[in-house]
Swiss-Prot record:
GO terms for biological process: translation. HAMAP family: Ribosomal_uS15_B. The gene is rpsO. This is Small ribosomal subunit protein uS15. Keywords: Ribonucleoprotein, Ribosomal protein, RNA-binding, rRNA-binding. Belongs to the universal ribosomal protein uS15 family. Coiled coil: none annotated. One of the primary rRNA binding proteins, it binds directly to 16S rRNA where it helps nucleate assembly of the platform of the 30S subunit by binding and bridging several RNA helices of the 16S rRNA. GO terms for molecular function: rRNA binding; structural constituent of ribosome. InterPro entries: Ribosomal_uS15 (IPR000589), Ribosomal_uS15_bac-type (IPR005290), uS15_NS1_RNA-bd_sf (IPR009068). Part of the 30S ribosomal subunit. Forms a bridge to the 50S subunit in the 70S ribosome, contacting the 23S rRNA. It comes from the Bacteria.
């Protein structure tokens, strides 16, 4: 993911201008990185170092989503619908 893609994601999921660290933004960025790394691992099946990084990212996203769900369940449902998670 290059800087332009990251900036676009930040603008789309920011809760206010200048917001780069809210849980929504973090989850959106992690989702993009997870998708890219998943595609990489489909080609490079033996890349176990990257697989471990993927598992760490999935765990981090899960923790952030748990935090959002605990604080505002409706917001959580909207976010996972926007991201296309939990089909």
């Amino acid at each position: 993911m290059d800087a332009a893609e990251k900036k676009k994601i930040i603008e789309e999921y920011a809760t206010h201008p200048g917001d780069t660290g809210s849980p929504d933004v973090q989850v959106a960025i992690l989702t993009k990185r997870i998708a890219e790394l998943t595609e990489h691992l489909k080609v490079h099946k033996g890349d176990h170092h990257s697989r471990r990084g993927l598992m760490l990212m999935v765990g981090q996203r899960r923790r952030l989503l748990n935090y959002i769900a605990k604080n505002d369940i409706e917001h959580y449902r909207e976010l996972i619908a926007r991201l296309g998670l939990r089909r």
